[in-house]
Curated annotation (Swiss-Prot):
Residue ranges that the Swiss-Prot or TrEMBL entry lists as coiled coil: 660-717
Disordered: annotated segments: 503-530, 753-772
Name of this protein: Phosphatidylinositol-3-phosphatase myotubularin-2
Source organism of the structure: Arabidopsis thaliana (Mouse-ear cress)
Reaction equation(s) it catalyzes: a 1,2-diacyl-sn-glycero-3-phospho-(1D-myo-inositol-3-phosphate) + H2O = a 1,2-diacyl-sn-glycero-3-phospho-(1D-myo-inositol) + phosphate; a 1,2-diacyl-sn-glycero-3-phospho-(1D-myo-inositol-3,5-bisphosphate) + H2O = a 1,2-diacyl-sn-glycero-3-phospho-(1D-myo-inositol-5-phosphate) + phosphate
Described function: Phosphatase with phosphoinositide 3'-phosphatase activity that can use phosphatidylinositol-3-phosphate (PtdIns3P) and phosphatidylinositol-3,5-diphosphate (PtdIns3,5P(2)) as substrates and produces phosphatidylinositol-5-phosphate (PtdIns5P); participates in pathway(s) that transfer gene regulatory signals to the nucleus.
Length: 833
């Protein structure tokens, strides 16, 4: 390998001109040097943009992104092309694309030499056009006189087309932090929900021993296909009418293409109506082949109407194909049902075209957007095309021509046909309580689109994140939509070998991009590469486009946003995760996808967990209470428009962002959330202050009670002291009180004059005594005061004798003052007997 130069070997002039190129990114400022080093220094190993297990394998300096005329460095990793801007050293999203997301790539030479490079020997004459499956057409310009382009093309040929499915990056990266759980368990849990058995949870033991065959009054789950012997493209568990035996199911499978017999995809929890799916019946060229078991199975969908005794519901058999295509399939043994053979049935043809028409339409739409966008792959602005300056680039005739090209692509017409068919199916189920059987040819493309969209309209659960995952895994993955064929990945054959899709020349496949090639030009004769174009078709992308149209009509009905759908399809096309590898559940089980690859659902959930409901994947207008039932859009509202978040993100990246309203609403939601948190914090502080105030009030009340009790106790003590004082006075005692609580009582012998000295104010000195002296003047006075021997008339009973109570009591009494605190003395103690 040559012409791949390590970063350390760049010329000084290129590094010095980086500041100048930041604003222009022009070819004029590049100094072209020949790259003669084939080694790579590994200087990009610490790039922040690299994913887990992603490593750089090649580097090409001085590459120009023709779409935006921006200079930079093109890197090739084991997963994708990366384009780093020379000025900012950041990834340029337009020039960064995973290998398997590339539909084709061509070597090109410019048709007309621009005046800008007319006399420049370093003009961009080595061009590589890369056409993506995500609507982008990118052109890289390489240095003349080098083998940069040759080396990049050679690397793309090897990395873009892995020989085996496990050579994909999904296996290199492994499950990592986005580990997968068993998808079979999730399918059974969804079946349980439909049967009204949500309390049951699936487990591996249940799957291994086959004990998942639950049922309700009308429907049951069968394990007849647990080993994929009944139908290799169907899931291991099927939901069928309870009245049909497994033997009858086996007989029915032989009458349907690829053994895809009619089974239930969704059932109404109230009315009992169902949406069933299958492939076309094998009625033959003369439309005269019949199957009693098939007719019985289909008739079992016409259960009795609730509230109508004996009346059975109507059955609509919806053939997604145009009638002429259904008749043409009769030559191959296929065809369509006859209403005369199926009980209470009506056959309806929706006229939706096949995968080849969708592929061509998608290609024409991509070319239209590249031609009339602001980042055309030929480097010319649409405003300057045809020499004009008006809208669309040119005069009135070019304006009308551009509108005509959009209409001629047919993409929006196909979207409208699908939406009209889905709305019709949903209305029959919701308004008539009718059952609907949907099929096309094989029953895995148009059938899957119609059935899953009808479920989305009828069941609000599928309009949530978890419900959307359940819907995709049930109707797209489990029922065998061939993702490997439709997306363009290595296939797994029945024998276990790996095969690559047949290459097809880009000149025969799609109309050319705006770098217009003419017969005989260098571009037309250059090499090209494409990936499985025979079976490639954007069926799943078209389904997501239909959902975006419904989200535009019902902006409050979906929990997820259009940005979520864009990131979802990007993850799918990149094959970074293993969920959508292979063509069927059986093949994914054989390859051990769930154990060895990362899970797209875990990755998307991890993105949302960082920001909660303010994440760009969350719809800020979501109101589940407003749309808690079926969505039945009228026919007049089914006029589709371009999906701006997906269709215009590469063609018109600098135009006004169509999600500005969502972004503003999301910012307001974040601000509201912050203010709500601040309010909650303020309320918490108010509650704390209120609690503190209540606590203080309680303490104040307690203090008040204590103070009241103390005052009452003091009053009682004062009263007791007064009583004691009177008692002591009656005894003619001299009492001496001290602050330490001691009290000395002395009783004098002779009658003395009674005197009562009130103690002075206590001094601050703790040793100051408080004394009280009491003496009697006469015995008569004492007797008159307190003697209990006085008669009622006031005379002493023994007037001639000396008072025996004076002089002989409390002699030498020494007491502790604290004893008085515990002494309760009442006036009644001293009343006369």
């Amino acid at each position: 390998m040559t012409a791949l130069r390590p970063l350390s070997g760049r010329s000084r002039s290129l590094r010095c001109s980086s500041e100048k190129m930041e604003g222009t990114g022009s070819w004029d400022v590049l100094e072209w040097t020949k790259l003669d080093s084939a080694s790579w220094s590994g200087s990009y190993s610490n790039l922040d943009c690299l994913l887990e297990s992603e490593r750089i394998i090649f580097e090409a300096c001085g590459v120009i992104l023709i779409n935006t005329d921006e200079a930079g460095t093109l890197l090739l990793s084991n997963f994708r092309i990366l384009f780093l801007s020379e000025g900012t050293r950041k990834l340029v999203p337009l020039g960064t694309i995973p290998f398997v997301a590339i539909e084709k790539f061509n070597k090109l030479a410019p048709k007309v030499q621009s005046n800008k490079y007319h006399n420049n020997e370093n003009a961009p004459t080595r061009l590589l056009q890369v056409t993506g499956k995500d609507m982008r057409i990118v052109v890289y310009g390489f240095r003349p006189g080098t083998k940069q382009r040759h080396t990049v093309v050679d690397t793309l040929l090897r990395c873009n087309k892995p020989e085996r499915v496990w050579d994909l990056y999904a296996f290199t990266c492994g499950p990592s932090q986005f580990g997968n759980t068993n998808p079979k368990e999730r399918l059974l849990n969804e079946y349980f929900r439909l049967l009204g058995k949500s309390s049951q949870r699936a487990s591996m033991n249940m799957i291994e021993d086959g004990s998942f065959t639950l049922s309700n009054d009308l429907w049951r789950i069968t394990n007849l296909n647990s080993n994929y012997d009944l139908c290799q493209s169907y899931p291991f568990a099927l939901m069928v009418p309870k009245s049909i035996s497994d033997e009858e199911l086996l007989q029915t499978s032989t009458f349907r293409a690829r053994c895809r017999l009619p089974v239930i995809s969704w059932c109404h929890p109230g009315s009992g109506a169902v949406i069933a799916r299958s492939s076309q019946p094998l009625v033959g060229l003369m439309m005269n082949m019949r199957s009693n078991s098939d007719e019985k199975l289909v008739a079992s969908f016409c259960t009795q109407l609730a509230g109508h005794k004996g009346a059975r519901r109507k059955l609509y058999i919806v053939d997604a194909r145009p009638r002429k295509n259904a008749l043409a399939n009769g030559a191959k043994g296929g065809g369509s049902e006859s209403s005369s053979n199926y009980l209470q049935s009506e056959i309806v043809f929706l006229g939706i075209d096949n995968i080849h028409a969708m592929r061509e339409s998608f290609s024409r739409l991509r070319d239209y957007l590249d031609m009339h966008g602001t980042t055309s792959s030929d480097g010319t602005s649409s405003f300057l095309r045809h020499g004009g300056w008006t809208w669309g680039g040119g005069n009135l005739s070019s304006m009308s021509a551009s509108v005509s090209v959009l209409g001629d692509s047919g993409w929006l017409s196909h979207i409208q046909s699908i939406l009209a068919g889905v709305a019709w199916i949903a209305a029959r189920v919701a308004m008539e309580s009718a059952s609907v059987l949907v099929h096309c040819s094989d029953g895995w493309d148009r059938t899957t689109q119609l059935v899953s969209l009808a479920c989305l309209l009828l069941d609000p659960y599928y309009r949530t994140f978890s419900g959307f995952q359940a819907l995709v895994e049930k109707d797209w993955l489990s029922f065998g939509h061939p993702f490997s064929d439709r997306v363009g990945m290595p296939n797994v054959s029945e024998s276990g070998n790996f095969e690559l899709p047949i290459q097809s020349s880009s000149a025969r496949s799609f109309p050319s991009s705006p770098v217009r090639q003419s017969p005989g030009s260098a571009a037309a004769q250059s090499s090209s590469s494409s990936y499985g174009l025979n079976n490639y078709s954007p069926i799943f992308l078209q389904w997501l486009d239909c959902i975006s149209q419904l989200m535009r009509m019902y902006p409050s009905a979906f929990e997820f946003s259009p940005t979520f759908l864009v990131d979802f399809i990007d993850c799918l096309l990149s094959c970074r995760f293993g969920n959508f590898l292979c063509n069927s559940e059986k093949e994914r089980q054989q390859c051990g996808i769930s154990e060895t690859c990362g899970c797209i659902w875990a990755y998307l959930a991890d993105l949302r967990s960082s920001s909660g409901t303010s994440h760009v994947h969350c719809n800020p207008f979501y109101d589940p209470s407003r749309y808690d039932g079926p969505l039945l859009p009228p026919a007049a509202a089914l006029a589709p428009t371009l999906w701006p978040q997906f269709h215009l993100r590469w063609a018109c990246p600098v135009e006004p962002n169509v999600t500005e309203t969502e972004d503003q609403c999301r910012a307001m939601t974040v601000k509201y959330s912050e203010m709500k948190k601040e309010k909650e914090e303020a309320e918490r502080k108010v509650d704390e202050l209120s609690s503190a105030m209540e606590s203080l009030n309680e303490e104040l009340l307690n203090e008040r009670d204590i103070s009241r009790a103390a005052r009452e106790s003091a009053k009682r003590a004062t009263k007791e002291r007064a009583v004691i004082s009177r008692a002591v006075q009656s005894l003619g005692c001299k009492v001496k009180f001290t602050r330490n609580g001691d009290c000395t009582v002395e009783v004098e012998d002779g009658p003395q004059k009674c005197s009562h000295s009130i103690p002075q104010k206590q001094s601050e000195d703790n040793t100051t005594d408080v004394s009280e002296s009491i003496s009697s003047v006469t015995e008569q006075n004492v007797c008159e005061a307190v003697c209990p021997l006085r008669t009622r008339e006031g005379t002493c009973r023994w007037p001639d004798a000396g008072c025996a109570r004076i002089g002989n009591q409390f002699l030498g009494l020494k007491t502790n003052f604290e004893a008085f605190d515990n002494l309760c003395v009442y006036d009644s103690y001293f009343t006369a007997e």
